[in-house]
Regions:
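Rossmann-fold NAD(P)-binding glycine/threonine-rich loop
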Residues: 73-77, 89-106, 115-123, 132-143
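Structural detector of well-ordered beta-strand residues that form the stable sheet scaffold
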Residues: 27, 46, 87, 120-122
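Rossmann-fold NAD(P) dinucleotide-binding segment
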Residues: 53-62, 66-89, 95
Length: 265
């Protein structure tokens, strides 16, 4: 499979390594800071203004986007305009806003059979296989404890000092999955409210080079239930992104990591 990378920071480099180890080809890299790239035989990385229009980018089966919050939507739209599906892992931007308004940006680039559907997109706040299992278990546990009653949830997330957004997109996803089950009633449009995750408080900690720790705590008067995921490195996130790209190839429309893993509950 031919892969384009959008963003060539630590995650981009890890994704490159995993993709190559699985037999894929990196045909294009787009980054705001062009530097020599070993996987392209010494060629320089494209800047966004030239990269998306390049023959190299258009030859990709899928693009994997890990950039910055302010650039993510623009990058996705530019990729789709060239008919290239996108796996996006950038957090801290208005994903739902894009999802609600997304249309084929350039119908001439799409095959006739997909003229009314944009090229495939997967966005996830976390591509780790383990975290996506955590999402599924968290959602199910919230439903069980809603029936039991008497439990109060809270979330703690810990990341390295370089992470730009807080709380993490993963923590927000966990809170989003808890809130409807635990707090929403018929006729009540409960929504996330800023950084506290609606009715679910989130504590964000930034320290050292921690790849990522997420803990969901349910406390009652008599006991405590805890769900916890701790990443050992970025490799798990990179592998999940490549698995998502393999699954997305040839598909149209908006998809989720839960679909990739068959975890829809």
């Amino acid at each position: 499979m031919k892969i384009a990378l959008i963003g060539y920071g630590k995650m981009g480099r890890m994704i490159e390594s995993v993709a190559l180890s699985r037999g894929h080809e990196i045909v294009c890299i787009i980054d705001a800071q062009p530097i020599p790239c070993p996987s392209l035989n010494g060629k320089k990385i494209f800047t966004p203004d030239k990269g998306f229009a390049s023959e190299a980018f258009r030859s990709a089966d899928v693009a994997i986007e890990f950039s910055r919050p302010e650039a993510a939507e623009r990058n996705i739209r530019a990729a789709l305009a060239q008919g290239v599906p996108v796996v996006c892992g950038t957090t801290g931007w208005d994903v739902e806003g894009l999802k609600a308004t997304l249309k084929p940006s350039n119908p001439q680039t799409l095959k006739p059979s997909t003229i009314n559907e944009h090229p495939g997109v997967i966005w996830s706040s976390n591509y780790s296989v383990g975290v996506n299992i955590l999402f599924a278990v968290n959602k199910y546990l919230a439903q069980l404890l809603q029936r039991a009653g008497g439990y109060t949830p809270s979330i703690t997330e810990v990341h390295h000092v370089h992470k730009l957004d807080a709380p993490s997109g993963t923590a927000k996803t966990l809170a989003e999955d808890i809130s409807p089950a635990l707090f929403s009633k018929e006729g009540d449009n409960t929504r996330l409210n800023g950084e506290c995750g609606g009715n679910v408080p989130i504590t964000s900690i930034r320290e050292g080079e921690v790849p990522g720790i997420h803990e969901v705590r349910w406390e009652s008067e008599v006991d405590i239930l805890t769900l916890r995921h701790e990443a050992k490195s970025r490799q798990g996130f990179a592998l999940g992104a490549v698995l998502a790209a393999e699954w997305l190839r040839g598909k149209t429309g908006w998809h989720s990591m839960a679909e990739v893993m068959g975890l829809n509950i």
